[in-house]
């Protein structure tokens, strides 16, 4: 099918054919496709002659350098695949130009041999714009065709001074103020990428994401922005800000108090904690489980022989589980027997995180955060893993938690701020987070003490421990503090942690 029309393109593209040993170079996509089509026609003609000699040996292999694709189904699969190589070549050129415009960035350091590895193509590129359903084998022509729909879309009046364009994609009702926004939106339907890394071949939806891909590969001494929550480092403040959104819990389980940052996390929680469905069943016994990983671990128990062996030279250790071999390797061959976990209350050290968990619960009477099944530990500058004392909640979730607390509060409850222990739940302003566990261990305390008015953005709400009828204190994660729009720096967090613990 001929191209549905030219679109503005960047100048001076060096489109180099990588079919076999071909060295053809041009600057226009139309000329590039014509050239590659000749390769395809010659290749397909040769494949037909081989098929006549041996009909059982029918296959369609791609000769693009560093590719290795082979289709046993039809020549149409190969045609779509090779045309995608052409489109990918253009994106890599655009990536090269974007990289050359950033004098402070170094090239990608990932494996150059993956530069021509492209995703599996669909059976066809189908336009689902209303009353269209055009089909293409060439992704370039398909994306241009969809662009034409956006450019020809008529404005609709929703009021006297307000006109919008509506997306005509099947099942979509989105509207936009201008055609450019509609064009960008359509990429979410077509999965179109606009730039690729010239080194590793990775494709991206915009230049910003591509340049982030490069910046993430900077050396450690250039990664000057550190996450105060998990200690990961980043090259730019914006990368850090994007990363920290993944720490903010925006979604709450409707069946318990578990909160999480992503819809996918909530789905997993619902499946593992509130569903009785166990679709993965063992063929050797009555065991069933909720995921494939657990089933594979279980199947190892049916093996009479050790399925896993230590690959260290002259070591004969073997075990029926991979985790046992990994643990053996860390302790015996890596010398990882030194304690890495330290209690933040009494400084006692442990070699394993679950031992510290038992210590915190029995020695210091810590409770898991309501709706959460375990403690989380964070590596500090001295190399020790200590209890993570900060959890970020969105404003909406915090208000929901506070409402539940107020509805169940006991006005006669005696408060004792010296007994405060636990997690600071930082309230973070902003919209929903990006797209992507056991039974509750006691409620968050019922009493609240307000250190300031709730309308004050700097107020802190202390959820303190209560004394039951037997005179036993129930120590829980106890501090909610509302901060400004971004999570606090390390220094501010440390100050609040010390205050929360009464230090």
Swiss-Prot record:
GO CC term, one of those recorded: nucleus
Keyword hit for Oxidoreductase: no
SUPFAM superfamilies recorded: beta-beta-alpha zinc fingers
Chief place where the protein resides: nucleus
Region (Interaction with NPAT): 369-503
Superkingdom of this protein's organism: Eukaryota
Zinc finger (C2H2-type): 17-39, 125-149, 165-189, 195-217, 225-247, 251-274, 280-302, 308-333, 341-364
Entry PTM: Ubiquitinated. Ubiquitination may lead to proteasome-mediated degradation.
Recorded coiled-coil stretches: none
GO molecular function: chromatin binding; DNA binding; DNA-binding transcription activator activity, RNA polymerase II-specific; DNA-binding transcription factor activity; DNA-binding transcription repressor activity, RNA polymerase II-specific; enzyme binding; histone binding; RNA polymerase II cis-regulatory region sequence-specific DNA binding
Compartments, record wording: Nucleus
UniProt cross-references to Pfam families, sorted A to Z: zf-C2H2 (PF00096), zf-C2H2_4 (PF13894)
Transmembrane segments: none
Entry keyword Chloroplast: no
InterPro entries, sorted: Znf_C2H2_sf (IPR036236), Znf_C2H2_type (IPR013087), ZnF_E-box_Homeobox (IPR051574)
Region called Disordered, residue ranges: 481-503
GO BP terms: cell cycle G1/S phase transition; DNA damage checkpoint signaling; DNA repair; DNA-templated transcription; establishment of protein localization; G1/S transition of mitotic cell cycle; in utero embryonic development; myoblast differentiation
UniProt biased composition (Basic and acidic residues): 493-503
Alphabetical UniProt keywords: Activator, DNA-binding, Metal-binding, Nucleus, Repeat, Repressor, Transcription, Transcription regulation, Ubl conjugation, Zinc, Zinc-finger
Residues covered by region (Required for activation of histone H4 transcription and contributes to DNA-binding): 370-403
Quaternary data: Binds MBD2 and a histone deacetylase complex. Interacts with NPAT.
The protein's role, per its UniProt record: Transcriptional repressor that binds to the consensus sequence 5'-CGGACGTT-3' and to the RB1 promoter. Transcriptional activator that promotes histone H4 gene transcription at the G1/S phase transition in conjunction with NPAT. Also activates transcription of the ATM and PRKDC genes. Autoregulates its expression by associating with its own promoter.
Protein name per the record: Histone H4 transcription factor
The species this protein was found in: Mus musculus
Gene transcribed to yield this protein: Hinfp
């Amino acid at each position: 099918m001929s191209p549905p029309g030219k679109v503005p393109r960047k100048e001076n593209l060096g489109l180099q054919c990588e079919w076999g040993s071909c060295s053809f170079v041009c600057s226009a996509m139309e000329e590039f496709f014509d050239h590659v089509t000749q390769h395809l026609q010659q290749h397909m003609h040769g494949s037909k002659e081989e098929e006549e000699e041996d009909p059982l040996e029918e296959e369609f292999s791609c000769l693009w350098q560093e590719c290795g694709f082979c289709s046993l189904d039809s020549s149409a699969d190969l045609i779509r695949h090779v045309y995608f190589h052409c489109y990918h070549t253009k994106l890599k050129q655009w990536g090269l130009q974007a990289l050359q415009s950033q004098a402070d960035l170094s090239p990608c350091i990932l494996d150059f041999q993956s530069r021509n590895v492209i995703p599996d193509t669909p059976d066809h590129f189908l336009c689902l714009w209303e009353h269209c359903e055009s089909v293409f084998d060439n992704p370039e022509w398909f994306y241009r065709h969809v662009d034409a729909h956006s450019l020809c879309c008529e404005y609709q009046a929703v009021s006297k001074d307000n006109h919008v364009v509506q997306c005509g994609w099947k099942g979509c009702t989105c509207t936009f103020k201008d055609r450019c926004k509609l064009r960008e939106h359509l990429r979410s339907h077509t999965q179109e990428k606009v730039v690729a890394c010239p080194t590793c071949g990775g494709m991206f939806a915009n230049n910003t994401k591509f340049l982030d891909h490069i910046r993430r590969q900077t050396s450690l001494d250039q990664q000057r922005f550190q996450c105060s929550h998990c200690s990961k480092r980043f090259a730019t403040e914006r990368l850090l800000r994007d990363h920290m959104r993944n720490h903010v819990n925006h979604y709450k389980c409707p069946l318990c108090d578990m909160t999480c940052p992503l819809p996918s996390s909530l789905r997993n929680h619902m499946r593992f904690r509130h569903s009785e469905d166990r679709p993965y069943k063992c063929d050797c016994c009555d065991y069933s489980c909720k995921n494939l990983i657990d089933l594979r671990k279980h199947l190892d128990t049916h093996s009479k022989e050790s399925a896993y062996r230590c690959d260290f030279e002259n070591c004969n250790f073997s075990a029926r589980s991979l985790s046992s071999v990994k643990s053996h390797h860390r302790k015996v061959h890596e010398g990882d027997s030194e304690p890495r976990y330290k209690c933040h209350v009494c400084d006692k050290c442990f070699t394993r995180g679950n031992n510290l968990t038992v210590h915190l619960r029995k020695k210091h009477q810590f409770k898991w955060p309501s709706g959460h099944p375990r403690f989380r530990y964070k590596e500090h500058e001295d190399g020790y893993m200590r209890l993570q004392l900060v959890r970020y909640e969105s404003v909406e979730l915090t208000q929901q938690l506070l409402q539940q607390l107020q509805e169940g509060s006991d006005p006669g409850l005696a408060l004792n701020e010296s007994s405060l222990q636990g997690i600071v739940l930082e309230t973070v302003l902003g919209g929903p987070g990006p797209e992507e566990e056991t039974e509750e261990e006691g409620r968050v305390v019922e009493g609240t003490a307000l250190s300031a008015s709730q309308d004050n953005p700097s107020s802190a709400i202390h959820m303190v421990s209560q004394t039951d009828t037997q005179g036993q204190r129930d120590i829980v994660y106890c501090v909610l503090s509302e901060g400004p729009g971004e999570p606090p720096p390390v220094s501010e967090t440390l100050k609040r942690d010390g205050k929360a613990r009464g230090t």
